[in-house]
């Protein structure tokens, strides 16, 4: 009987995912924990590892297709594993295959296989298993995170006796084994990605007087659409548009750009804006709130996490700079660059897109100026930044050319009054006009 592997519950309340890429094809041989596919939901790209060792029989879902949790996505010829899917509630409900899923951003690398060849080592404690009795072909039931934890601790997981359901190895088993005096395991081998399955043939060109095509919305695009509609239907938006002379800011960045580069950091204007917005959230706490629409309660946030909207090929993602009030401009700049790279590569972990106090969105990178950004509900404000353009301004009674930054602040009028929003925007402008104040006040 073939082993049918169903799309597992990957948490975060996600019930479906798009098969972005298959790393295996029919007739490929796979081991436990070899990466089978990348699945993209509205939170992140997730790697799906194999729960069995065997041969791939059939890919049930093509690349680019959305599969639902519980749907069979691949079948294996896996002798000895056929009963794994019929173990009953103890196994399926407790682990529910979600234990076999690992976020690419959380892991930071592909799931690795355990080294098959190990040299016997001397036992040094009561908890040590007899090294000579280890079966190199022993099948181990364990979460990828537990396997990774075992590798980090230098433990050959095949030597550990599992205490979980059906002999599943848990972290506590690894700790007990280590406390018993385990020797370091041999270096691991990284599972090499296998050839991808052939892509389906391109759809025929549309014909007729008004040619059209239809395609399913991606998981990320559906999530964006739902969030935008919910925000506009829930929060009465008002947008203030202003501009600020950033002559001193441009000079300050130029002065410290090389200092940052010497530390491997690309210094942009965005971290200055993050610090200015953080200062505004402190000075005007109403901007750092949200409304519980079910209980009609106001939630005051006592943390300062700034979301940074990032434009990617697959849609808009919002990674979050945590505790921006405790970080320097250099630290924030480095973190933003790292998060932006992850966003473009589709490797953001769900945890890296949670917990924002307020969000910044940058239309200036696309050459825009003023716009009406949509609030990232349940936040109550969003700061939009446009391009820096040379403009004629009046300074000391004279008309001079100066770099001017366009700013747009959208706010939820249920929580924030217009004057309060303008005062907050004025505070941001003051700090960006004189970046020395960021050191003093932000």
Swiss-Prot record:
Residues 84-136, 182-215 are annotated as: Disordered. Keywords: Acyltransferase, Lipoyl, Transferase. One of its GO terms (biological process) is tricarboxylic acid cycle. Residues 141-178 form the Peripheral subunit-binding (PSBD) domain. GO terms for cellular component: cytosol. PROSITE patterns: BIOTINYL_LIPOYL, LIPOYL, PSBD. Residues 2-77 form the Lipoyl-binding domain. Binds 1 lipoyl cofactor covalently. It is an enzyme of class 2 (transferase). It catalyses: N(6)-[(R)-dihydrolipoyl]-L-lysyl-[protein] + acetyl-CoA = N(6)-[(R)-S(8)-acetyldihydrolipoyl]-L-lysyl-[protein] + CoA. InterPro entries: 2-oxoA_DH_lipoyl-BS, 2-oxoacid_DH_actylTfrase, 2-oxoacid_DH_E2_comp, Biotin_lipoyl, CAT-like_dom_sf, E3-bd_dom_sf, PSBD, Single_hybrid_motif. The modification N6-lipoyllysine is found at residue 43. Residues 182-208 have a biased composition (Low complexity). Its cofactor is (R)-lipoate. The active site is at 413. One of its GO terms (molecular function) is dihydrolipoyllysine-residue acetyltransferase activity. Residues 84-97 have a biased composition (Basic and acidic residues). Its EC number is 2.3.1.12. The pyruvate dehydrogenase complex catalyzes the overall conversion of pyruvate to acetyl-CoA and CO(2). It contains multiple copies of three enzymatic components: pyruvate dehydrogenase (E1), dihydrolipoamide acetyltransferase (E2) and lipoamide dehydrogenase (E3). Forms a 24-polypeptide structural core with octahedral symmetry. Belongs to the 2-oxoacid dehydrogenase family. This is Dihydrolipoyllysine-residue acetyltransferase component of pyruvate dehydrogenase complex. It comes from Bacillus subtilis (strain 168). The gene is pdhC.
